């Protein structure tokens, strides 16, 4: 039986169509995925992300442990509340999960990991934390609401008390602060400004209702997917998994190669991959009628005249742009155009960087 978040009843009251998402009953949409998408791009929308797993790590060797566990380097985190995006890799350099790590004090860090990978993540973290003497607390007592869009922070702030408003004033992206009952972070999965707010389960429903009254539109998984794809953000299980290198998933920027003597899980394999080359993630744009879909083959001819085939990892119709976009994993050497076969038609697509929309504006 699928689990329910503490906001399940609120979703049904808001008219949600509920679906099973990796063992959780979650809203797909509340009537119109397109309207929800546009609300986030132009005003403010919110998502129940309580299915995500929050893991608190404590102990004097926590930083040392995370420098070994993660491909990115938490040595970069020197200011309390600062967050870092990283892959957590296996020994062969595949991605076990992508996550966000927050630094609070030398002996207190927080991870936010994906719901679909919860059990294997917790097992992996626990296994490798043992020699470092880390105390691991899974925060199942917390719900999480993501409020996203150009007006999201202002609308959310109407629910904050004076101390909370002061705590977030001037807070830069990728920071988090505990202010009273709320953990407020300037993170998100849409390419827009906003907050991800963790709060006690018993307070989540009232907070959700207050956000609705403040003019924040409830949004489901459908809009969350089109928004993240427009922003060029990876979805675990599509752009990357345990068999895919971060170098082939546009995550090379999250690998901290320096200092060269830092040993992290997967480093040796990544260094070989870096030397020999890997596939890469690109963007595809198709302005003709039709929709680029997951797992369609992408064919192209390189400069030497050799033919190659890649694959679409995520594809959709972009509500913001009004045409189809996709992320695709291909070999190096792809040019400015490629061919995608949709049913029995060969469609020409433009090859771009793997990002399409930033702050509501087209970049592709």
Swiss-Prot record:
Keyword list, A-Z: Aminotransferase, Transferase
A GO BP annotation: glycine decarboxylation via glycine cleavage system
InterPro entries given in the database record: GCS_T, GCS_T_bac, GCST_C, GCV_T_N, GcvT/YgfZ/DmdA, GcvT/YgfZ_C, TrmE/GcvT_dom1
GO cellular component terms listed in the entry, alphabetical order: cytosol; glycine cleavage complex
Class in the EC hierarchy, top level: transferase
Disulfide-bond pairs as recorded: none
Superkingdom of origin: Bacteria
Catalytic activity: N(6)-[(R)-S(8)-aminomethyldihydrolipoyl]-L-lysyl-[protein] + (6S)-5,6,7,8-tetrahydrofolate = N(6)-[(R)-dihydrolipoyl]-L-lysyl-[protein] + (6R)-5,10-methylene-5,6,7,8-tetrahydrofolate + NH4(+)
EC numbers for this chain: 2.1.2.10
Molecular function, one GO term: aminomethyltransferase activity
PANTHER family: AMINOMETHYLTRANSFERASE, AMINOMETHYLTRANSFERASE, MITOCHONDRIAL
NCBIfam families: gcvT, PRK00389.1
Family indicated by similarity: Belongs to the GcvT family.
Biological role: The glycine cleavage system catalyzes the degradation of glycine.
Quaternary state and interactors: The glycine cleavage system is composed of four proteins: P, T, L and H.
Protein name per UniProt: Aminomethyltransferase
Organism for this UniProt entry: Shigella sonnei (strain Ss046)
């Amino acid at each position: 039986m699928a689990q329910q978040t503490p906001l399940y009843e609120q979703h049904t009251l808001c008219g949600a169509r509920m679906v099973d998402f990796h063992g959780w009953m979650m809203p797909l949409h509340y009537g119109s995925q397109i309207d929800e998408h546009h609300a986030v791009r132009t005003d403010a929308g919110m998502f129940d992300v309580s299915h995500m797993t929050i893991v608190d790590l404590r102990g004097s060797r926590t930083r040392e442990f995370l420098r070994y566990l993660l491909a990115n380097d938490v040595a970069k985190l020197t200011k309390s509340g600062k967050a870092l995006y990283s892959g957590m890799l296996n020994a062969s350099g595949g991605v076990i999960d992508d996550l966000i790590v927050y630094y609070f004090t030398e002996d207190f860090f927080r991870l936010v990991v994906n719901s679909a990978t919860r059990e294997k993540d917790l097992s992996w973290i626990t296994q490798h934390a043992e020699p470092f003497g880390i105390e691991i607390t899974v925060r199942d007592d917390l719900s999480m609401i993501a409020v996203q869009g150009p007006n999201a922070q202002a609308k959310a702030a109407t629910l904050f008390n004076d101390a909370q408003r002061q705590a977030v004033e001037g807070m830069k992206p990728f920071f988090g602060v505990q202010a009273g009952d709320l953990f407020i972070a300037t993170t998100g999965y849409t390419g827009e400004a906003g907050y991800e707010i963790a709060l006690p389960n018993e307070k989540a429903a009232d907070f959700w209702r207050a956000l609705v009254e403040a003019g924040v539109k409830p949004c489901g998984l459908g809009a969350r997917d089109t928004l993240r794809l427009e922003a060029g953000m990876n979805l675990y299980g599509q752009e990357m998994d345990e068999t895919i290198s971060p170098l082939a998933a546009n995550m090379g920027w999250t690998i901290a190669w320096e200092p060269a003597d830092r040993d992290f899980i997967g480093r040796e394999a990544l260094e070989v991959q870096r030397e020999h080359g890997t596939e890469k993630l690109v963007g595809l744009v198709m302005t003709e009628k039709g929709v680029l879909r997951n797992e369609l083959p992408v064919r192209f001819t390189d400069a030497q005249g050799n033919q190659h085939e890649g694959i679409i990892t995520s594809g959709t119709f972009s509500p913001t742009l009004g045409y189809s976009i996709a992320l695709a994993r291909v070999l190096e050497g792809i040019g400015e155009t490629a061919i995608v076969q949709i049913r029995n038609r060969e469609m020409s697509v433009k090859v771009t960087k793997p990002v399409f929309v930033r702050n509501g504006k087209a970049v592709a």
